Design a protein with these regions (language model features):
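Short, solvent-exposed amphipathic alpha-helices that sit
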Residues: 45-59, 141-145, 169-189, 204, ...
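Hydrophobic alpha-helical
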Residues: 92-111, 178, 194, 198-260
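N-terminal secretory signal peptides and thylakoid transit peptides that target proteins
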Residues: 1-14
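Extracytoplasmic "Venus flytrap"
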Residues: 33-60, 66-82, 90, 96-100, ...
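Hinge/cleft segment of the Venus flytrap/periplasmic-binding protein
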Residues: 30, 166-170, 181-183, 284-337
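Short beta-strand elements in bilobed, periplasmic/extracellular small-molecule ligand-binding domains
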Residues: 59-70, 184-200
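Hydrophobic alpha-helical segments within soluble ligand-binding/sensing domains
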Residues: 78, 133-159, 173, 204-206, ...
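Flexible loop/hinge segments that line or gate small-molecule binding clefts
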Residues: 100-140, 147-151, 158, 164, ...
Length: 337
């Protein structure tokens, strides 16, 4: 796993994006087409992943990035998108899955046609991809989410989780790790009262947060491990006049969370750099399609400015530790991503 991002490293990713525009191609690829399939279009986190992917494609040279995804966060719509890409005979697919198992058949179909398939962010089950690129270590993400809200509410009170879809691979893994952290004695007075799902849709996430306020009048915190849900929950807190009574934490983008932090609805939240994630996923998918890497367990892939990515025995790799944002740094980072 790569070392923890510092302020300069995170900002450096964006500097590299600008600098890379005029850089000489690393490889003279011959019309390699890489499709980045996201959970749904119109989500800021994935738009930032796209920007990183475009940087990688430019750096490699001769690589076309096709950024696509469904309009709704369903496996059915993602399957249709992948089927379309198979028909287009793309060279590689990097997908963030809405359902770890439901995507396996269509991804296996793609691979049987010679398309190199990797998953990133939210993984496809191993039999449906070559490798999985995790944005960070799963255990660290889960622990971080619990630690942040615990610090804000002093380890005491009712807390709920507002997640994406019930089938989301990454959110479910993070929630499982949250519960492991929660079992520690220091959280004995901090009770998990509910887990609800907003399906990564802003309106539904907002309504789910409102429902939590009504169902749990003593609620003190909401953990939202989703960039859509955390913004919606924070807005619900502000609109309900609950700032200072209910706090929202989790995973979000600084550019989208600035208002919540300054308003006091959110004390701290975390995320990794989505530009780096999209850059690395595109770089790896393209290099595998070119035959420059295999993605096999135990191998290492040199992913441009992100350095060497080591593939673990389970054919997965992890990037940086989650980075914490609060009032002390939100202004700086909100200008970056």
């Amino acid at each position: 796993m790569l070392s923890r991002r510092t302020l300069l490293q995170l900002m450096g990713g964006v500097s590299a994006l600008a600098a890379g525009a005029g850089a000489a191609p690393v490889f003279a690829a011959d019309n390699i087409r890489v499709a980045m399939v996201v959970k749904a279009l119109g989500i800021g986190f994935f738009d930032a992943c796209r920007d990183g992917g475009l940087e990688a494609a430019k750096e490699l040279g001769g690589v076309e990035l096709i950024y696509t995804g469904p309009t709704k966060t369903t496996a059915e719509e993602q399957i249709a998108v992948v089927d379309s890409l198979i028909a287009q005979k793309v060279d590689a697919i990097a997908i963030s899955a809405n359902d770890t198992n439901a995507l396996v058949p269509v991804c296996k179909k793609a691979m049987s046609r010679g398309i190199k398939v990797i998953s990133f962010d939210s993984g496809v089950a191993p039999e449906g991809r070559i490798m999985q690129l995790d944005p960070s270590n799963t255990a660290l993400i889960g622990a971080k989410c619990v630690q942040m809200i615990a610090k804000t509410i002093h380890n005491e009170g009712d807390v709920a989780i507002l997640s994406a879809t019930a089938q989301a691979t990454n959110q479910n893994a993070w929630i499982a790790e949250m519960k492991k952290e929660w079992a520690k004695p220091e959280y004995a007075k901090m009770k998990l009262v509910a887990t609800v799902y907003g399906d990564d849709v802003a309106d539904k996430s907002y309504r789910e947060a409102q429902g939590l306020f009504k169902s749990y009048p003593d609620l003190k915190g909401i953990i939202a491990p989703t960039s859509v849900g955390i913004v919606a929950a924070a807005k619900a807190v502000v609109d309900a006049g609950l700032v200072g009574k209910v706090y929202v934490s989790g995973l979000g983008l600084p550019s989208e969370m600035k208002g919540a932090v300054l308003a006091g609805a959110t004390d701290t939240f975390a995320i990794w750099n989505p530009i780096d994630l999209g850059y690395t996923a595109t770089m790896i998918a393209a290099l595998i399609a070119m035959g420059k890497a295999t993605g096999a367990p135990g191998t290492t892939i040199h992913a441009g400015r992100m350095g060497d990515i080591k593939i673990g025995p389970d054919a997965s790799a992890a990037m940086a530790d989650p980075f914490t944002f609060d009032k002390s740094n939100i202004e700086k980072f909100s200008k970056i991503f």
